[in-house]
C-alpha cells in the first residue's frame, strides 16, 4: 500500500506543470534558462569603433520587458525558446 501511495505521489509531481521558464541564447552557441519573471529573449546589436573590421557587437539575453531602444542600437525581442540566435546562424 505504501509503495502504491509513493508511486502516485511521484507520478503526480512529475505530471504537474511546476512553472515554465524561458530558454534564451546567452551567446552565439550557449543557451540558458531565464530567471523567473523573465519571459522574453532579446538580441541587441550596435556598432562601435571596430564595426568595420569585426562587425556589429551583439548582446543576447533574457528580459521581463523588451529593453529600451537607444539611438544606434537595434533590439529584437521574442517570446519562444531560443528565438534570439546569432543573425548568421538563423535558418
From Swiss-Prot:
Disulfide bond entries: 24-41, 34-62, 47-51, 66-77, 78-83
Gene Ontology, cellular component aspect: extracellular region
CDD domains for this protein: TFP_snake_toxin
GO molecular function, one term: toxin activity
Tissues expressed in: Expressed by the venom gland.
PROSITE patterns: SNAKE_TOXIN
Record-given protein name: Long neurotoxin OH-57
Amino acid at each position: 500500500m505504501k509503495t502504491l501511495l509513493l508511486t502516485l505521489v511521484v507520478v503526480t509531481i512529475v505530471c504537474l506543470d511546476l512553472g515554465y521558464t524561458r530558454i534564451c541564447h546567452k551567446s552565439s552557441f550557449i543557451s540558458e534558462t531565464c530567471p523567473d519573471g523573465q519571459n522574453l529573449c532579446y538580441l541587441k546589436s550596435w556598432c562601435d569603433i571596430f564595426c568595420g573590421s569585426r562587425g556589429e557587437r551583439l548582446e543576447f539575453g533574457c528580459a521581463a520587458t523588451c529593453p529600451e531602444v537607444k539611438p544606434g542600437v537595434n533590439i529584437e525581442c521574442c517570446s519562444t525558446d531560443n528565438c534570439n540566435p546569432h543573425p548568421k546562424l538563423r535558418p
